[in-house]
Amino acid sequence: MSEQLSIADARQAEAIGRQVVLQGWVRTRRDSKAGFSFLELNDGSCFGNIQVIASADLENYEQEIKKLSAGCSVSVVGLVKESPGKGQTTEIEATAVTVHGLADTETYPLQKKRHSFEFLRTIAHLRPRTNTFGAIARVRNCICNSIHQFFQEDGFLYIHTPVITTSDCEGAGEMFQVTTLELDKVPKTEAKVDFTQDFFDRPAYLTVSGQLEAEIFACGLGKVYTFGPTFRAENSNTARHLAEFWMVEPEMAFYDLEDNMRVAERMLKRIFRDVLEKCPEDMEFFNLRIDKTVIETLEKIIDADFVRLPYTEAVDILTASGEKFEFPVDWGTDLQSEHERYLTEKHFQCPVILYDYPRQIKPFYMRVNDDGHTVRAMDVLVPKVGEIIGGSQREERLDVLQQRMKEQNLEPEGYWWYLDLRRYGTVPHSGFGLGLERVLQFVTGMANIRDVIPFPRTPGTAEF
């Protein structure tokens, strides 16, 4: 009796001699004058294809098998044999090929030629069938699994924070509003929208971060993390911005900024190590076709110590560098991507953790240092991408937190529960946010962030 195998398993030497059922999509078909056809089959379980040898003796050979083309779906029953072909361990000698669905060669968008990533974004429902996007999906899966394993093995609890919220973690106001009010008949009181008639009885938004809610659980359960979609209504049409993306956000009670840095560094190294070990074919593809330095870069980072650098020293290095930056460097301004890349690619040539940023450019929840001018913020910078992690030690002192909220014109009534955490058993605690898509860009070398998420959401684009 035949056993169903993935193509990933059927390509291993251990499968030789087994009668199997494989299912997948045809990549190519070529016919031999000797009376058989070679099918290249892929099912998404791995980067590589498996070769199927279909004999002319099969009953549907002339009517169906010889009409197969890229995109057709089939089931194959056959014997796994050692392949004499170069670069492949096994092949399948088919005893039956069942055709499930054909793909018209005249209209099927994925032809043998290379397609631009811009074109593939217009057919996001088909791009997982390409080498590039199949590889991205597998690496994305590996990274997510690695993140969960890292935190679970370290005693963190995985919690779920709300997607719909009434608070703005970043205080930037760039949030998507959620409402059931009819937009052409919005109820008003004294020229203002009457939100008491809305679903939640108040303004509600899609979350920009689960951090504040994660702090609730950290301040009762110790170490937690959340991993889910977040939303930013920034009108940014760049290769680094999405309106919807995925974030992992750990929060740790009794952790200071140094502890926070250590967790962030260990997590990144674990992710990079797992990707290299578990997705070798996919990474070889990215190294060959996208960026010839990705594997070497990851290997160097795994073996390197991340540089810890105060913001003030970073500004001194940048101003003394002699580089002509598009954006001038001054103490008190946020560093731009070009500054971050100079530090990681030219000056230190390794990842850098910047910390102790100016108070006025960071959110209200970051702990104020004793100098009164800086806060316990940190950003992890990596070559080619720049910032990949942002975090801080949180402000645990009630009076200081209230003053910071006042400075940033935040209404304390909307954060009463957040202030309560400082009233009852307050504790030093820290956390950070890691953008999944930024990590994927770095690991794969993909230039545009829209190509590392299945269905990109950007200004003017919400297809599928």
Predicted regions and their residues:
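Generic non-transmembrane alpha-helical segments
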Residues: 146-154, 267-278
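A translation/RNA-centric and nucleic-acid-associated enzymatic feature enriched
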Residues: 164, 174-273, 284-464
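Class II aminoacyl-tRNA synthetase-like tRNA-binding/catalytic domains
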Residues: 2-249, 253
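Residue-level recognition of alpha-helix termini/interfacial anchor residues
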Residues: 61, 278-282
